[in-house]
């Protein structure tokens, strides 16, 4: 046991003090106590434990009683325990008397047995302030058999038999003499509630008000009510006290009376008080105050044997368990009941944890007031089914029903708080029921909203009233009364069904209701289809944002009046079951129009959603459901009218309409998705779409509107209300001739998609009435007829098939609004139906009427008039074959387009000849109609003015006879044929004078004798026909208006030679007129400022071009006949104008324009045949247009003839004006008259002049050698670069192209190479000067201080050292002497090793690395050169006679040079693009210098060193070839470059500067470098194919340069040197800056 270690500690400390002479039997094994002997002491007189008197001591002896002795009371004498902290094993009653035992000192006893004298007892008196501690320790057989008395004789206890632990059978009354006396149970072998240590009925308490009862170890059951009178009862952790006792009076046991208290000690507060209700004993426990508290104490009421009651003495409204504050609760409260035995708690219960357990099913617990386990508290149901009834608001905390069929009953208006779980061990076991009698609430005890309030079998609303639920519930909701209402708070989740099983008390379910205060979820079915199990109402929260999510498959409402109510602000029902078909047997009641949402968007195509009820209100006071979203389900709207503002259909979803009235304001669906099904009904064939319904939309049409399988009445009629629109890909039927559309409500409707177009599944009929306009957008098929009545309009946008179209009241209109060609298919009829008022063509698409069937004798449509309106300009209407034009009225309001784009609507007639007479209405002056022959029939026009043109649908078809002209009143028609290239009429005949205000497009046109035709006008000016002038004698005339466009194949012929006239009234394209054998009488051009394009030959007795400008459009145009007059420009293009015969006179305004195409060699010519003569004075300017794209890579002169037969040209051409177009700018043109008197055009190569001029005007004009290089470039005409240059169109581009090739950067690069090597030499010279300065004794006067002298002397001790000098140089050379400048940046480092070979000689070696980037400037800007150099040097310094010295170096440098030079390339279109010519070559530079100097102390601390010497450098590039360009890579051959320089200058060293241990040596210097000899190499470069090389540009850099610089050397010790320096170099148009660092390590 957990208490044993403490107990052992007590007995070990207490068992050492005894004072007795009795025999001792050890009560323990000796292991724990360390006892060597076991004693038994018997009484023979009044005995105490302080001495041996009264015990079985030896004669004359007074032996103290040993610790842990068994005292066997075998004499009728009292026993007094006077030993302080006395510890005896036990008391054994072995006399037939009750014995008195007095506790005068704290005493511990084990067993107290009367096993030998069972009717007798020890009666204890505990003195004031003393403790009787009972451990219940027993003894074993071995111990009982081996005890010895005080004489050490074997004396068995109980005959050697064992005495069980916790044998307190001999315990009688306990009298507390005075306060505070203590009785303590501290059992060595602790007992439990299941097997307690039971004190018999003789164990009583006397004067309990003076005493304290401590239960420190063990579970004690008392049988006498006197224990309740103990002043203080203390129960330690895990220990217990059980009252199974006699009552105080009338079955009642009073606890904590008169200030008595029952306390629960210990850290955990797990001590337990058990109150047992038992027949013949106490059944009611009346508690003064409260039991437990401060989260301590477990109190159990056990009524397993008989019903019992726990009562608060202050009344039920007072706490009986714990108190109502955070820490005031008891640790636990347990109620144990059994079948039929009720437990009643009449008082408030505040316990942290509560247990309801029933030994067998049927136990009942009634709480007559509050039950509250507090935050984090628990309630557990155990063992068997039970029932709990509460009467006040209660908190059961986390409640575990333990998988028992347990019920909690909540009375009217009360709140039950908790989190109720059917089975903690298995969440799937949803046991337990919570039943509300009427009004009430069930709320969570947890602050975590994610913790379920219930996970049980059911929550029941048994009576009329409102049960409020919140949080998460995994339970069935059951309604037991028509007035029962579950009210769900916002966020409530019911994870279970509603009204599926009978109530707990087997009462039947009732049609109660559910009311929502916010969003909620119900996952199970609602109602089970039974009359009483169906719900009456579900009322949603009055909040549009709140959602009721239903996951059940059956949402069953009452058969009559069952409704889901959407309040004023709507709300949402969301159906979430994705596995089963769903049935909603409710009306959906809408309070405010366009509110409420039913969201079934998660349903799949495998599910059917059936709504058996009305939705909203359709008729008066319309109230629509804001949205019904069916997801992808198959939805059936059944058993009621439906009003929906938005119907949402997801992919493949469908909605079935079942012969009610449906208002669906808007359908939302993905394009081409969703289906509406019109169901069949044997009793009712009508389904009505209420006014304002829209199925689908233009942007997102439905997939299908479908008429289901027919019923007994065969047809299904869809009555379509006012303004209803049907948008679907297809409107279909399952059976042929089933499905009719009736539009009888007025307004305008749209029907989209294919209607009834499936093979064998045509719809039945279509009816329009009552002023309704219906527009069909797709192909439409009705097997029956189409009726248009009551001034209704049927608008057709696509192919339309019906038996016939009729209007019984002659008020119907058929309007075509199609944008593409369509066909209307009708059946021929046996008799006419009602005639339409009119047929209107409003769209741009053509319409063809096609009639089928051979039985009928009349047409399937008839109309009073045809009218073209709106967008029908240019639209063709093909009348049913056999319909003549004779009596038709054809109107138009669409005009005829613009002046430059005449157009007209068209009526096509076929299969019959027609005649048009005066008075027949066809078009008007502002609205011309086009009549077209669709077959080889004829039209005879007798009307004087026909506001129409006539054309044909195919070539060589149709005959037109025009006879409407009258004397002095020519007939008028608006065109015969459409335009050039369109089908030609077969024959047109003019029998009277006519004005044709359009084109003539026909195979043959005959103008009868003495008839004049004027043709061309607003309807067209094209001419593509053969006109025959005259029917017999040829005296006919044709006149062409301005802007006549004759097809080149058209012609005008005369019946007889020299008869008939042709007149052009304005600009014209002219084709063939007359023939060599039959010329016409005259051809005249009478317009002003006009021109004629001649496409064919003209043969006429007289040709007068007037002042027309002529353009020759055919390769050869012949002018023949008698005389020809020309007084305008002749533009030959590249064609020939041939004067075949006769005399041509050119007036003063005559000029010639010709075009030379050099690439083909074609030039426009005038050819004067031998039988012809041209007379002219000096003509105007001769314009020569030249298209010259040919290559100019030719030499000499090319010639082209302009006038052939010049000997027959009597006149002089005007001075030429050359207009050269094309890419060739390198040729020169002239016009000459050769020895044959022909006029000839010459073409001469002019490349050298063009290039020289272009370069002279460019930036390189003054560049040295550029003129020579240009000449060499142009001499090499076989190079690719030369030929590419000839593609140039702009002379400035030519200069750029040539300049990039003819100039170079070699001089600059060579100069930089030499300069880079010289920089390294300068660094070596500087190094030598520094060494000499630091190490030479002659400089000691400059040291300036002791410290300086020491430092200087240190250098003398250094034999060698390593140094490094990194540097950075920037240099800029401006343009000089015509040579482009450059900018160079050099970075590098020189690393050297030097040593003092002797006192007067220093030598060293160095290696250097440099990197130079050159950016060339001026006309070479964009060119770049990179140089990477590696140098090797030897250097030294020799001290000569005093103060004189010599120093020098030798250097060898290898440079890797990479150049990028800009070159150019011309595309074939003359566009110039940039290319890069890349060079990659090696350079070698070497040389050396020798300089002499003298050290001179000019003044104290100043050393002046004048110096002079010579330097020599030589450089050489390897030969290389550039890469990277198309035509401009050059091959470069180089020679050596060298340079000899004179160097003169001086250095000045000042006094050292000492900073702590650092010495600084300052220095300044200046030098002049003058080039005394040497030259740059003359590099030669050539392009591929070039014979003479380009010469390189000369060296124009300055010969003299100037340097000034300063430096400082720093020494911190003898081992390390540092330095910094700056140099500035300057020459003519040249500057350079260089910075240097230095570090040296001396060894």
UniProtKB/Swiss-Prot annotation:
One of its GO terms (cellular component) is extracellular region. Residues 1329-1352 form a propeptide. It comes from the Bacteria. Keywords: Cell outer membrane, Membrane, Periplasm, Secreted, Transmembrane, Transmembrane beta strand, Virulence. InterPro entries: Autotransporte_beta, Autotransporte_beta_dom_sf, OM_autotransptr_brl_dom, OmpB_passenger_Rickettsia, OmpB_ricketsia. It holds the Pfam family Autotransporter. Residues 1355-1643 form the Autotransporter domain. The 120 kDa surface-exposed protein is a major structural protein which may play a role as a rickettsial virulence factor and/or immunogen during infection. The 32 kDa beta peptide may serve as a membrane anchor. It has been shown to adhere to biotinylated Vero cell proteins. NCBIfam families: autotrans_barl (TIGR01414), ompB_ricketsia (NF041657). Belongs to the rickettsiae OmpA/OmpB family. This is Outer membrane protein B. It comes from Rickettsia prowazekii (strain Madrid E). The gene is ompB.
